[in-house]
């Protein structure tokens, strides 16, 4: 009796494994199509600006898999590299310089910004008070 139960369990394990492999293959095919279509390519580069008390380092991945997926699908990604624990005015001044540096490096006219938490405040300040509004195509803030 036990061998029959084992065979039944093995059957369900194999059935589940085959379904998972098929699903993974389908997902990879979709990812390949997305990559070849470059669905995340934008006219302007994207600047990711983190929130307070974080740094853009390779030791801690603040943004998770978002930058990787955006780049894999055609986007050009940059990071703020600013001191987020500084005042909004000081952080905004750093971000202004970073934006001008990126525009110079890429030759782009403008930049798209995705900012989290205090990074959004820093960017809004830079846009409204430091005169770079004409260099920013979009600002998306997330909480």
Language-model features: where?
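Residue-level signature of transmembrane alpha-helix interfaces in integral membrane proteins
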Residues: 16-22, 26, 66-67, 90, ...
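Serine-dependent carboxylesterase/thioesterase catalytic core
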Residues: 50, 77, 93-143
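Flexible, membrane-associating and regulatory peripheral segments of lipid-active enzymes
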Residues: 1-64
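Active-site catalytic motif of lipid deacylating hydrolases and related acyltransferases
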Residues: 38-110
